Amino acid sequence: LGDTPERIPEVLQRYQALRRVDVLRLQNAAWNAMEWFENVGERYADQLPPEQFMYSMLTRSQRISHENLRLRDKAWLEGFERWFAESAGLQLPAHVPAPPPMFTPYTVRGVTLKNRVVVSPMAQYSCVDGLPGDYHLVHLGARAMGGAGLVVAEMTCPTPDARITPGCPGLWNEAQRDAWMRIVDHVHAHSDARIAMQLGHAGPKGSTNAPWDATGADHPLPEGNWPLIAASALPYLEDGAIPRAMTRD
């Protein structure tokens, strides 16, 4: 390509285009490793168990995954998995392979999850007057029966004016309490998953359309709006309602 001086700029430009992404990946891996040594390595070197510290160090660049380690040193990783499983409370016979760390129990403040798979909150915008119904029972129940250790229900609002949209769930009256209890009882009866709730407040994003509304997601409702309160008197979008800034009173 560079057989004449006039083509040198073109060659350099093509070389940069081909190599730029790979160079960025290497730089990012180096940056991650540097931050690990500056933070994890310095703060926890004398606190973490040797096995955990070594695993953290080997994966510090975020370019070497759990299964990558198996390709590099299968015996070491199997020993680490057994140590991790026993640290999580599993008693495994010598002939039984240890499960991957994701599928070991995890205990938080006296609550033990059967594994470390967590279903994150997923906003559904499908309530009427904040009341979860059959849709939510099926949605959350299916995730619980799918094998996750913990299922977290979508953002639930403690007051009507804390909602993002009219379809957001709430927990400000007894009817909603009973509806949530029905879902919790269903999860407990048909799975060994734990279920939790994400409590939240819309802030400046409140009183807006559902994502699929023809007038545009996150834009103010055409009617039936409610007053907003937020950390500051700034709208969520330029054409959004201006919330009242919170005070200590």
Segments (PLM) and residue ranges:
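Short, hinge-like loop/turn segments at secondary-structure boundaries
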Residues: 42, 169-171, 213-216
